[in-house]
Amino acid sequence: MIDTKLIVAIVVGVWALLFVVRMSIQKKRESKATDYRASNADKALLHLYGKKFSIDGRDLSLFETVSGENLEKIVALPEGSHRIAGVYQSTEVSALGQNINLESEMVEFDAELEKGHSYSVAMYAYSPEERREYYKGDVPRDVLSVPLTLVKGSENVKAYIIVYQES
């Protein structure tokens, strides 16, 4: 019969090995994202959270991108107005403590981007004003807010696509 100590040692060994591999992959991803930001400092950096993105009518896969944290895609764009389309995803916690996965339909809008700045585009369950109030004003500048509703034409907004200028 296999000894309990041997089983525990094997489990701990496998866990330690997988931990080291995961940390190595994370470090490479962070290094790649940092290098990408540095080499594109003269452009507008757009951080996208979702899927099926296109920019100016071109699929995101045609752009040079890097992956960041939390499945974000980072793309460098020239300064100016850009048409951004995509399906945005977010996770919110309900009053009962359950995770709720939110997903928009295809949303398309124009955003004015300035070179040398970083922008995040994501879906939130609250408005920019509510976030500003909650964090007592310590939030990035919101460039654009697109309210989403469950029923077309409804005034009861349930989520927002917000473009924040991070830097």
Task: For each feature predicted by the language model, list its residue ranges.
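Short loop/turn and low-complexity linker motifs enriched in small/turn-promoting residues
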Residues: 1-76, 87-167
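A short tyrosine-centered beta-strand micro-motif
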Residues: 80-84
